[in-house]
């Protein structure tokens, strides 16, 4: 438990950064109503804050949604629909709910958009590297581990050969993996998908102002009570002080970051991180520490942040410029900040 808490520290600090930024930049009427709660889902701490109400029911309903979708979409929950698809790989179709089908179709769409750099059949390769468990169980401050934890090239190439989202077959609500050794993993887009569903629910209940934070997936509902933008902090990689490397100003937008500091370990000082290159099977090698995507949809932000990290700055910029309503912020390994536009007032002050 001690080691897991160590890796939750950046999440807690990120929550504090967002809340602090919002509080510091907003002059609120004394009578303004607000309710905020935290919960633990998806192996991380989530926080939902609503303005204009003190009714916790809306947040509790969102937490119920988190539990429902975790039980439906997680490949670590044995009875989930995704686990059933994996268990039946190469054998038979599995009938799934409309929500699971929607997310799988989105995953396939992102696979096409990224030319396979984002692939929801990466499950076995991710399991092989085992970043979450290894990083959580090390007592080293720098996540230094024994060289024996690094998989062999033969193992990596073997699992990589089963990473191909085109092996997903869909017939109505029936889904099958045609490769018996493939494994579906929706973790790269599930939190964004769930955040979008929560926002839609809140809007249906006439909630017009709030923040949904699912462990780094920040989705704002509407704008602040005075009509101004929210200020959201972008985490400084490998920093546990809580100070953001920069902030952005947004309203009714999603802010999602993928970074190598989220799950990693080191062997003899060499860093291995969880963002895997689907062309090599190894952690992506480039000069990036993190990529943040600002978009309308948190699900889009999830997929695009991973994709853009894998592509590298130049190709990622080309992709972002081809999309409508999407911008990116890149943090390089020398802590330089590169943006695709100045629309969201990126500030380091």
Where are each of the predicted segments found?
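Mature catalytic core of soluble alpha/beta enzymes
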Residues: 2-349
């Amino acid at each position: 438990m001690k080691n897991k808490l160590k890796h939750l520290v950046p999440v807690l600090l990120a929550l504090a950064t967002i809340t602090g930024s919002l509080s510091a930049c907003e002059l609120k009427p004394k009578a303004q109503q607000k309710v905020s709660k935290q919960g633990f889902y998806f192996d991380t701490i989530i926080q939902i804050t609503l303005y204009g109400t003190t009714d916790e029911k809306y947040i509790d309903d969102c937490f119920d949604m988190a539990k429902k979708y975790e039980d439906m979409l997680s490949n670590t929950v044995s009875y989930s629909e995704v686990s059933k698809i994996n268990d039946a790989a190469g054998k038979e179709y599995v009938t799934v709910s409309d929500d699971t089908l929607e997310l799988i179709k989105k995953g396939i769409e992102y696979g096409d958009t990224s030319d396979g750099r984002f692939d929801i059949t990466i499950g076995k390769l991710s399991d092989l590297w085992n970043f979450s468990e290894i990083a959580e169980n090390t007592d080293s401050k720098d996540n230094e581990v024994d060289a024996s934890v690094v998989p062999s090239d033969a193992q990596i190439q073997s699992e990589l050969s089963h990473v191909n989202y085109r092996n997903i077959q869909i017939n109505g609500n029936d889904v099958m993996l045609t490769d018996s050794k493939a494994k579906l993993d929706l973790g790269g887009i599930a939190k964004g998908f769930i955040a979008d569903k929560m926002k839609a629910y809140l809007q249906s209940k006439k909630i017009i102002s709030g923040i949904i934070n699912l462990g780094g997936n920040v989705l704002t509902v509407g704008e602040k009570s005075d009509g101004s933008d929210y200020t959201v902090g972008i985490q400084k990689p490998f920093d546990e002080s809580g100070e953001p490397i920069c902030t952005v100003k947004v309203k009714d937008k999603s802010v999602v970051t993928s970074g190598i500091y989220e799950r990693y370990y080191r062997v003899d000082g060499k860093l291995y991180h969880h963002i895997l290159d689907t062309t090599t099977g190894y952690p992506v090698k480039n000069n990036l520490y993190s990529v943040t995507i600002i978009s309308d949809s948190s699900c889009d932000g999830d997929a695009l942040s991973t994709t853009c990290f894998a592509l590298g700055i130049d190709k990622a910029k080309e992709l972002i410029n081809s999309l409508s309503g999407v911008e990116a912020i890149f943090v390089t390994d020398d802590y330089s900040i590169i943006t695709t536009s100045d629309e969201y007032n990126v500030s380091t002050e």
